[in-house]
């Protein structure tokens, strides 16, 4: 489906880093960056920009959890391709140092994406305002709306409507639980309460609908779409970059570099990292639950494939039986 307003944001490093604590080698990240440059993808998210803490020590987490300026400059300066994507990083509310953020003129970062839950909306909007004051393009990614009370979602949207510093408002299917009807429902809800806002979508593939739901977002008028190469991301992963580029039929995109980096980098990586659909993550999506329990279950080789046992435990937790 060709529509020139549509932009693709590849978040392979940021979402994929949730699998391995951002322990990607610099050569791997440079290979991903080069593929994104040559593919014509509009934006690449290089990771999270968190502060080191007892929760997130550098002894446990890799460079892409912090996205220090010198590290990003090494990657961006390593390749000049057929296009130069904008550089994005993600903020998590409560885990950042907004006072230490450089002005845009002193950074290779173009866009800061602020992720929050509905109950954190006031803090998130303050962060967005301060990022905009420093010259950055901004997105607000409201997570886990499928598990939120709709009246609270509406209240959050009313706050966004009064915050013009938000360049893009994101619908995020954090648990990979949405069906297309729910996607349309939330898009209409967002448009009702924030009618002038540009919007984006970030899907997860727990019930194997990330690609289909991204297509539904296009039909419903969203123009900024998140993807990951080979669908690599937390748990069941995300909408694959290579599939969406093919679907969009936009001549500015070239899918061959994406398949090349999959063959050279991602296929070997699959031998040591797991991502993509399986029945454990499917259960998490069907029950609209955070995938952390599924990921913990999969990490235990003795029971990793015991989907019936996992379902029994999860449904008892939901029903209270």
Where are these regions (language model features)?
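Catalytic cores and adjacent flexible loops of soluble metabolic enzymes
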Residues: 1-321
